[in-house]
Amino acid sequence: MTLDTLIGGDCRQVLQTLPDGCVDCCVTSPPYNIGLDYGTADDRKSDDDYLAFTRDYLAECYRVLKDDGRFCLNIGYKVSTVKEAGIDYVELLNLINSIGYTLRETIIWVKSKRPDDPQSFCGSNTAWGSWMSAANPICRARMEFIFVLNKNSFKKHHRGISTMTRQEFMDCASTVWYFPAERSRLHKAPFPVDLPYRCIQFYTYQGDVVLDPFIGSGTTAVACVRTGRRYIGIEQNPDYIRMAEGRIQQEKQQLKNRQVC
């Protein structure tokens, strides 16, 4: 199995080529099924098709995880007048349990720079529903979930090298995380590097293997390079793979420059 690699293709098929129990941690944010144009993937499936799609990749990730593996799954909070927009998180949790995962933590990612500044909210959801009227008001989703799952063992079977600072540990050891969302003209739904960085620092050791089946523009791989982890990324869109490769090389060069200094 090749590490530190990006693989092109549908993750449901690519994952089948990986051996059982080869990954220490999965960190990903799957398509939310809200109609975004990713270039090669259908982001407007029927409810049944989206649930089947979700079941397929979650089951394959479960298989490739080690017995003590963790899965950090970033998923949006479904707030929409359109039934097909996204997957209800209750349905998702039921599906997760049926596959065999155990829910370890539910982290709330608040898309703000800090808790005392609600105006710093930075996100893509601009729907208010009926403006200043009781006709059909809609609450804006200022948060998303990060479901932290275990395969079997809650405790790691081996001791490794932790690389987080004391402050990083304190920031991660909370069920509410504050940092802004990412914006990009090149990718429809990027997530900020803070998200995989925190998950990787908190739940893995140096040298562990991290899988992202929806690597997109490479954010999880960048976080792996930054923290000294190995990565496997899967992505359907060849343009995103090229973008990710560029970001990874840039991160490696910056790391090399810091080591020289």
Regions found by a protein language model. Give the residues of each.
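Core catalytic lobe of class I
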Residues: 1-234, 238-243
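Charged C-terminal helix
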Residues: 240, 260-261
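Short, conserved SAM-binding/catalytic segment
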Residues: 1, 245-260
